[in-house]
Regions:
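Hydrophobic alpha-helical signal peptides and transmembrane signal-/tail-anchor segments
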Residues: 3-5, 100
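Leucine-biased recognition of intrinsically disordered, low-complexity hydrophobic segments
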Residues: 5-8, 36
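Positively charged n-region of N-terminal signal peptides that target proteins for export
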Residues: 9-16
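Sec-dependent N-terminal signal peptides
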Residues: 18-20
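Residue-level signal for mature regions of secreted extracellular proteins and peptides
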Residues: 22-23, 240
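C-terminal motif of bacterial Sec signal peptides marking the signal peptidase cleavage site
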Residues: 25-28
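Negatively charged
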Residues: 31-248
Length: 248
């Protein structure tokens, strides 16, 4: 009997020891395994937006710094630095911090570079940005114009421009005076623009010789009658003009 008890005692202790060793090894390995498999990806100051086109910056990106993305260097700019970069013919810019793009390319008759990747989500004024930029005819249909209030003179005498901007968000715009004044090539469908906040459209299509798109669906409840020179010397017929004072 004593021999049997000793046998049971010895084997039970062995089994208990094996169980304790297994638990101990499992606990001690877990932190190491977690350390090896858990990593934190670094956040780069600039990045490609989900649309696959726009270059954007995080808040911690430094104005004036250059950052490389997909093999291209982009300079981060704001309102106080963008003009100098344009003057130096640098358009590889990250414009997330820019609010004012007024007259950026005014009278630059040779400018015709791709800037569709610019982040314009914070821009509030584009007044005369392409005024007399007679060579410019690049796709900028991707621009986020949802914050823009002033588009006056935007394509004033931009005689080559004829790109699709029909999907622009113009819901915040109040001023479109002279927007396509003598933009002699422009003839794109912009009939779906939200013009419900626009209060000024004088000379908007003055001498826009090619333009004859249907604008009868525009909401122009803030403008009671046809503004002076709205479509003077253009080919826009009366029956497809906005119905002034109404919001269809």
């Amino acid at each position: 009997i004593i021999s049997i008890l000793n046998y049971l005692k010895t084997n039970t202790m062995k089994k208990l020891l094996l169980v304790l060793l297994f638990i101990s090894s499992t606990v001690s390995c877990s932190p190491d395994e977690e350390t090896l498999t858990t990593t934190t990806e670094p956040i780069f100051p600039i990045y490609l937006d989900s649309n696959g086109i726009t270059i954007k910056a995080y808040d911690f990106a430094l104005v004036g710094n250059e950052y490389e993305l997909n093999g291209v260097s982009y300079t981060v700019v704001d309102d106080s630095t963008i003009d100098a970069q344009i003057a130096n013919a640098n358009v590889n810019l990250c414009t997330t911090f820019v609010n004012n793009m007024s007259e950026l390319f005014k009278d630059n008759s040779s400018f015709n570079s791709d800037i569709n990747f610019w982040d314009t989500s914070s821009v509030t004024t584009m007044n005369s940005i392409f005024e007399n930029a007679t060579a410019f005819n690049q796709d900028i249909g991707n621009w986020d114009t949802s914050s823009v209030t002033d588009m006056a003179g935007m394509f004033y005498e931009a005689s080559s421009f004829n790109q699709d901007i029909g999907n622009w968000n113009t819901s915040s715009v109040t001023d479109m005076v002279g927007m396509f004044y003598e933009a002699s090539s422009f003839n794109q469908d912009i009939g779906s623009w939200d013009t419900s906040k626009v209060t000024s459209m004088e000379r908007m299509f003055w001498a826009a010789e090619a333009f004859n798109q249907d604008l009868s669906g525009w909401c122009v409840s803030n403008i009671s009658s046809e503004p002076a020179g709205f479509a003077t010397s253009s080919t826009l017929p009366n029956f497809i003009k906005p119905v002034w004072g109404t919001c269809p």
